[in-house]
Every structure is written in C-alpha cells, then in structure tokens.
Amino acid sequence: MKNFMTEDFLLTTETAKRLYHEYAADQPIYDYHCHLSPQEIAENRRFTDLGEIWLEGDHYKWRAMRTAGIEERLVTGNASFKEKYQAWAKTVPQCIGNPIYHWTHLELRRPFGITDVLFSPKTADAIWDQCNEMLQQPEFSARGIMQQMKVKMVGTTDDPADSLEHHKFIANDNSFDIAVTPSWRPDRAFKVDHVGFKDYLNKLGKAADINITRFSDLIAALAQRLEVFDAHGCRSADHGIEIMRFANEPSETDLDAILTKRINEQALTELEIAQFSSAVQAWLGKQYAKKGWVMQLHIGARRNNSSRMFKLIGGDSGFDSMDDRAFAEPLSGFLNTLDQSDELPKTILYCLNPMHNEMLATMAGNFQGGGVAGKVQFGSGWWFNDQLDGMQRQLTSVAQMGLLSQFVGMLTDSRSFLSYTRHEYFRRLLCEMIGGWVERGEAPADMALLGEMVKGICAGNAKKYFGF
C-alpha cells in the first residue's frame, strides 16, 4: 500500500519518476487558454479568505456540492464564504474517485505548502486559519500566485467588443513579467440564432464605430477589432461551438437577407443559420492565418440543461454536459474550405465527448503541412475529460494517430488562480505513461530523447506553436 499523494504521486516506475522530477516538474507554464479575469490580474487582486479564492467561480466544485446534497444557498447563494467553505469541507471526503479530490489536495500543497493533511470537516478550521494568514502576504495575491507557479504567459478569453484596457495596463507594467495576452472569442458574432444577437451587433458596432446593418458591416467591424486585438498581443482565437454546422457560403445578398431577418427578429431556417455561421467563421479563419494566430475550436458542449437553474443563477454555473451528436462531416467541410485556398491557420480541435477522440485525432492528420510541426492538433482533454482516464485516452489517441512529440500540452481552461496544479497533474500522468512504455520495452530507455520530448510537451511546444 502506498501513501497518498507523495512526491512520487502517480509515478509508479523509476523511468516515470526520473522523467517527472528531472525534466517535467520545473518547466514553466504557458497557459494558453483560460478564463481568468484580466482585471483581477491588472489590479493584483487580494483574496480575503480560502473560501473566496476556492469557491467564488468554480463550477466543478459547485456540481460536486450539489451532488453531495448541499443546498444552493451554500453553493452560489448569499451564504458567507466561511459557510460555503464549511460545506465544501463536508463535500470533499465524498469526492474520492473524482479528480476534484486530487485537485483539492494539490491546491493545498501548491502554493500553500500544506501536505500530509486530508481536507475534511475535522481539518477545515486549521487549514482555514493557515491559508487565510498566507493570503494576506504579497506572494499570495493574484500575481504572486502566478509567479510562484512559474507561469510565463496566460491567454485570457475576450469578446471582440472588449476594450482590452486591462491587458494594456498589464503590458505597460514593468514590475510584472508574465505575459497576459487576450484571446479572441467571437461566438456572439457568428451565433446568429442565439438570443441577444441583435443587441450584440449594437455592442460590437459601438466598439468599432460602425453601424451594422449589412454583412459587410459586420465583417468591417470584426476586421477593425481584430487589428486592436493583434496590437495587444493576441495570438489565439477560440470558438465555442455547441453545434458544428457547415454550409457552402451563399452570395453576400443572401447573407444580407439573413442578417436583416435576424435584426427584425424573424426566425431563421437551419440552412440559413449554417450559412451565416460558416461564412463568418471561414472569413475569420482566413484572417487568423494571415496574422499567424492559432484557431481553437471547442466543440460539443450541451449548455444550460436546467432551464430552471439558468433562470435563477445564469450560465456557466455547473449545468452543462456532453452532447452526442456527430460532427465529422461539417468539421471536415469547414477545415477543407480554409485549406482549399491554403488559408487554414494553425488549429487545435477539442471535443467534450470522448467518443469523438479518434475522429478528431485522425481529422487533424488530414490537414497537416506547410512546414508547420503539428499544424492541426487534437487538443488536451477538455472540461469533463481533464482527469486521469480522460487525459490518458486523449494522449493515447494523439500518440497512436499523430505525433505526441509535437503536442502543445495542457491548459487550465479555468477561472481560478489555484488551478495551475492541473499542469502538474497532467505532467505526472504524461511521465507515468511514457515511463510505462519504457518499462514494457515499447519505447527506448533513452532519457535524453524522452526528456526533451517531455519538456516540449510540458512547455516548449506551446511556446513555439503560439509564438510566445
């Protein structure tokens, strides 16, 4: 029997231990996709207590608490963070087998240095006092935690209409050496069927100083904002796609007619929705290619399943799940449209349902070339898949159907400043997997070769791929 979460946590072979401790552990973090608030980084937010920094916006924890029978008042309601923290302490011992149990204890270890203590109602008060005292120190501010965790850059998630004022402030602050770059998230500009699309056109038009009444106006507004993002260091776009649609682009007259119908709040056909979203995204993809940006496609989340809870507390609150619809055909059509004119940017494909893993891994192989290593990639296990089984399945698919050596590695996709330990979680699993290959004679015991591969996957590949 092994002790829980030692320094060799998840590492069962000597090769795995060497790969992790000698090559992976000290690599910097390039967190190229996250949902951190740039304002909180700019203002160097200080957190009052452990409940606030742990529970304020973490829908993973919220889902677990609800499943454990915690009432909503103690999850997202008006209870104090001390009360919510106590409810969380009751929940965590029930989470064994869920990655949250590992994440919780990793987050206590780093950055707080709390080891050899299991989080529970019995230990919660002492941990509360110890962590709260540390949170008052400069190294436990938002920026301080990032520096402790050896973060080199983060890519936040930003709407085309955002001012980027906080990114500008951070870039001009010579006292902070971590790059905080915006990432272009244009979902509201191409999801013509969504509630609020008309209002969003007004918001985008105001940001670009363009009155959007025709398709060409929308493109002009997006083009103007693309330049602003590029000037602020943007290197990546991210499209959140619940339903992957594709249709051949119609005439601009037809696109104008679709836009006019939507502005007049008339219903659109499924074909019109596909035509409009495809046209906008195809135009965007070509712009990314010109600028050298990376295009990330997150596909297959089924959002806001509980309409009752959506009305009560809004989206991104723990009521999303995997969809199971097929999307190989429309995805292929979309990528091929860009590739036909050699205007496909570097692209990372993510699926929420792991039934699509092998499809995406092989789809990526269709569109390599141009002298770019790993130009199109099957991205890291996303959301419900950033746990041991999910990450191993994703890594195995990449290794068997692509080149694991070119993989750009892990990202947090998180709203929490304590989530950087997910990079450690990923790195340990990666080294365990490769170490297992060596122990079974499936890979050579060449530590220099494997060590460089591990270093690349942990940090170097992302740095090169995104141009950081």
UniProtKB/Swiss-Prot annotation:
GO terms for biological process: D-galacturonate catabolic process; D-glucuronate catabolic process. The keyword Isomerase applies. It comes from the Bacteria. The keyword Metal-binding does not apply. Pathway: Carbohydrate metabolism; pentose and glucuronate interconversion. It catalyses: D-glucuronate = D-fructuronate; aldehydo-D-galacturonate = keto-D-tagaturonate. Pfam families: UxaC. One of its GO terms (molecular function) is glucuronate isomerase activity. InterPro entries: Metal_Hydrolase, Uronate_isomerase. Gene3D superfamilies: Metal-dependent hydrolases, uronate isomerase, domain 2, chain A. Its EC number is 5.3.1.12. Keywords: Isomerase. Coiled coil: none annotated. HAMAP family: UxaC. Belongs to the metallo-dependent hydrolases superfamily. Uronate isomerase family. NCBIfam families: PRK02925.1. This is Uronate isomerase. The gene is uxaC.
